[in-house]
């Protein structure tokens, strides 16, 4: 048994050389689009009609209304209407491709173009593991999950609210989360959007970690604001949008849509609604700061019309992504959408097939930034420790898939045919020996041995293997390097702002 485990460890060590370890994935295959030119024209015309005839509400923020009014939009109370083509004209200043810089330059990522990123789940108040079950998340969980994502090569981004640390007061949670992303990882991360001062704090912490001038001149934060579908942007999201736009940081406009309740029950109508909401909101970003990085985002989950609950891994969810990506390309914006979503409460077969369906659909659609790619359980109410490493394994496989096939002369292996001849085998061929470490992708989570091997090694189910891997990763974790002066500045900022906000020491 010991020998078998030793062999497995050696195989994993060798296969690690074959893993995707670049900061992001470069696609070398085409995308799947389910919308033709005639349908595109119809959806775009319908979005224009929605904005022209119905309009969109921008609530609770007089400055936003004044910005639109001064630019020539039609403002009536909090309702703003736009002439056809007006929003597209403003959106043209947004970059098609840009770089989000990480604290470690080697981990900076391209957003848009042929780049694809896998990002953690966002926002769950609960965590789950197979030993302790479901429970409220704490800042300790936040730290552990950030360490996991830092250690997983297949995860390209540290994320944002990977879990909600409910043991901390709400007004200071953003400080601890940004501090964790900056000190426990050196991958790029997401900014706070729940209040303007929290956005400003996040930007300031990045200035401490990466240099004021650098942050003022480059994109270092990727932040998501959600519309309140249908056709509403509320004051909280508007405040965050304005802060990040003025700072030249990336803002993703992602309508949160539960199909059948927050949009009509058809994919076609939902596409028009989402396009309208994104165009109006990105136009605002470009009015505030032309050229500010902006991203077309979506979160679409059809409701079960029997129970009223969101559903995941559905045909309609994938169809929607495979159309929305084309609409984003037409606007010249990078595309952000969802990955491994599931309604399952534990990392079981339902979690596997729903997550794989949604994740594969996102990859084939060509989504540039795949959020919720790891960890989702219970429709994003929960992040699962085991689910994180299980999903990351699928991300690694799909990253290998989109790199395409090697058709080089070496890959043709003609000398191997001559060496082996008819009736032979290739296991000992020179070509095999030269390429066996990189020939086929080999994951960490699947058991491919015989039944006898599996039994001898404990008969572990996948969630058992995942639990062991989580413990191993956390045991072996080493924090990325950070200058002691920068670390002290971040610690001091956290302590000072905590005292200013709460009157208590951190």
Language-model segments: which ranges?
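N-terminal intrinsically disordered, cationic/polar leader segments
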Residues: 2-14, 18-40, 48-52, 58-73, ...
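Catalytic-core signal marking the mid-to-C-terminal active-site face
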Residues: 2-22, 34-46, 54-55, 60-67, ...
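Short beta-alpha connecting loops at secondary-structure transitions
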Residues: 29-32, 307-312, 340-347, 376-387
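Generic structural signal for well-ordered, non-membrane alpha-helical segments
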Residues: 36, 40-47, 57, 61, ...
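Flexible, glycine/charged-enriched surface loops at secondary-structure junctions
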Residues: 57-65, 76-79, 156, 216-217, ...
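Helix-rich catalytic cores of soluble enzyme domains
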Residues: 133-364, 368
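Glycine-rich phosphate-binding active-site loops on the catalytic face of alpha/beta enzymes
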Residues: 360-382
């Amino acid at each position: 048994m010991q020998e078998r485990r030793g062999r497995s460890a050696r195989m994993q060590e060798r296969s690690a050389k074959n893993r995707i370890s670049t900061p992001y994935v470069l696609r070398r295959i085409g995308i799947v689009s389910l919308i033709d030119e005639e349908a595109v024209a119809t959806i775009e015309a319908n979005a224009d009609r929605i904005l022209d005839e119905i309009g969109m509400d921008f609530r609770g923020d007089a400055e936003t209304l004044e910005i639109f009014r001064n630019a020539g939009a039609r403002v009536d109370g909090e309702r703003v209407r736009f002439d056809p083509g007006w929003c597209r004209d403003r959106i043209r200043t947004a970059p098609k491709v840009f770089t989000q810089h990480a604290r470690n330059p080697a981990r900076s990522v391209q957003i848009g173009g042929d780049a694809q990123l896998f990002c953690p789940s966002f926002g769950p108040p609960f965590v789950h593991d197979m030993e302790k079950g479901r429970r409220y998340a704490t800042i300790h969980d936040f730290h552990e999950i950030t360490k996991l994502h830092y250690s997983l090569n297949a995860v390209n981004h540290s994320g944002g609210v990977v879990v909600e640390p409910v043991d901390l007061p709400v007004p200071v949670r953003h400080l601890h989360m940004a501090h964790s992303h900056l000190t426990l990882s050196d991958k790029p991360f997401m900014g706070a959007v729940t209040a303007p001062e929290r956005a400003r704090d996040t930007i300031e912490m990045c200035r401490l970690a990466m240099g004021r001038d650098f942050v003022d001149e480059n994109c270092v934060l990727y932040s998501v604001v959600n519309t309140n579908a249908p056709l509403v942007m509320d004051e909280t999201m508007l405040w965050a949008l304005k802060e990040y736009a003025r700072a030249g940081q990336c803002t993703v406009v992602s309508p949160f849509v539960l199909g059948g309740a927050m949009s009509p029950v058809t994919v076609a109508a939902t596409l028009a609604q989402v396009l309208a909401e994104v165009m109006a909101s990105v136009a605002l970003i470009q009015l505030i700061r032309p050229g500010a990085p902006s991203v077309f985002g979506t979160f679409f989950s059809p409701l079960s019309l029997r129970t009223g609950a969101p559903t995941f891994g559905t045909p309609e969810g994938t169809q929607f992504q495979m159309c929305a990506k084309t609409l984003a390309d037409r606007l010249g914006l990078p595309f952000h959408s969802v990955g491994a979503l599931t309604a399952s409460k534990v990392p079981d077969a339902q979690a596997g097939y729903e997550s794989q369906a949604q994740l594969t659909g996102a990859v084939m659609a060509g989504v540039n930034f795949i959020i919720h790619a790891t960890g989702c359980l219970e429709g994003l109410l929960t992040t699962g420790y085991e689910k994180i490493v299980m999903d990351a394994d699928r991300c690694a496989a799909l990253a290998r898939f989109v790199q395409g096939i090697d058709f080089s002369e070496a890959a043709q292996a003609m000398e191997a045919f001559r060496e082996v001849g008819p009736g032979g085998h290739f296991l000992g061929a020179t070509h095999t020996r030269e390429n066996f470490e990189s020939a086929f992708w080999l994951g960490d989570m699947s058991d491919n041995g015989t039944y006898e091997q599996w039994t001898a090694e404990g008969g572990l189910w996948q969630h058992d293997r995942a639990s062991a891997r989580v413990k191993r990763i956390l045991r072996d974790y080493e924090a990325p390097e950070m200058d002691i002066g920068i670390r002290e500045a971040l610690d001091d900022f956290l302590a000072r702002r905590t005292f200013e906000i709460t009157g208590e020491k951190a």
